[in-house]
Regions:
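Catalytic center-proximal scaffold of phosphoryl-transfer enzymes
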Residues: 1-282
Length: 282
């Protein structure tokens, strides 16, 4: 709990220094492009669900094998907080690494939630991209990949042709009744609402990293069967887990980068595991 609290306090000090005191983060790394993605994960709470937010920023993807890619210069933020506080902490933290004024194009990805789109306010020249995982899920909830309408809609989406999307869905609606028709109507509304984030752009790279980040950083450790979380406990552990995959947090916490020996890294992993067990038992 203590280590997680220290990380939260450090993030809040950094946020206040930027958004209350008006200081400019001193990030020195320059990148023409920046990719940022964000999502939520719901945990079982004590009475009501606990909602964790996670965001990741990176410069792009690089091959690390025949079938794998890694995020270049990955920086992670997580915790239990409202959308505004999340983006203020995230932008302040990422600003300690990158010179955000040098970013020529920022691509923000997510599931279309309002709080995710709030991130557009914090990054220069940012545009929104709907996460491909959520787009595929919305399509498959209403259409079978084996039917012609699915293929027609996908082709129209790739072409940025909203009229083509509407035409295909309108044709399909003629033969639908009951729940199947309702699902198709929901799909049409979803695509219309998020069309600006769906339309393919030759300049926009493929995003789609956030689902894996949520799983590997948070969900596989915190969504254990039977575990119930307090907001404070979940927030503190989420920050610890973020620090494990993003050691740059140590620079924010201690004021300078730290050289961590393998022995200390192992001790840190064991301490995190003990904290997880204690929080689940509380």
């Amino acid at each position: 709990q203590r280590a997680g609290r220290r990380l939260k306090e450090a993030a809040e000090r950094l946020r206040r220094s930027v958004f209350v005191e008006g200081q400019v983060p001193e990030g020195r790394r320059r990148s023409a492009q920046l990719h940022a993605e964000a999502d939520e994960v719901y945990l079982r709470g004590r009475g009501q669900p606990v909602v964790l937010k996670l965001g990741v920023a990176y410069e792009g993807k690089q091959a690390v094998g025949s079938n794998r890619q890694a995020l270049r210069e990955r920086r992670v933020v997580a915790g239990v907080m409202p959308g505004t506080a999340f983006w203020e902490q995230a932008s302040a933290y990422w600003g300690t690494h990158w010179d955000l004024s040098a970013v020529q194009a920022c691509y923000l990805g997510g599931d279309g939630a309002h709080w995710v789109k709030q991130g557009l306010q914090y990054f220069p020249r940012a545009c929104y991209r709907l996460d491909p995982f959520h787009l595929r899920r919305a399509l498959r909830e209403a259409l079978s990949p084996s039917e012609e309408t699915y293929a027609q809609v996908c082709r129209a989406i790739e072409a940025g042709d909203w009229a083509g999307v509407e035409s295909a869905l309108r044709q399909a609606l003629r033969g639908r009744r009951g729940p199947a028709r309702e699902r198709l109507l929901r799909l049409r509304g979803y695509l219309r609402e998020h069309w600006d984030g769906i339309v393919a752009s030759g300049e926009a790279p493929r995003l789609g990293a956030i689902e894996a980040e949520v799983f590997h950083v948070l969900a596989r450790r915190m969504k254990r069967h039977g575990a119930r979380w307090s907001e404070r406990g979940a927030d503190h552990l989420a920050r610890l887990l973020s620090e494990r995959v993003d050691p740059h947090w140590r620079a924010v916490l201690g004021g300078r980068p730290l050289q961590i020996s393998p022995g200390v890294r192992q001790a840190t992993r064991q301490a995190v595991q003990r904290v997880m067990r204690q929080l689940e038992e509380d």
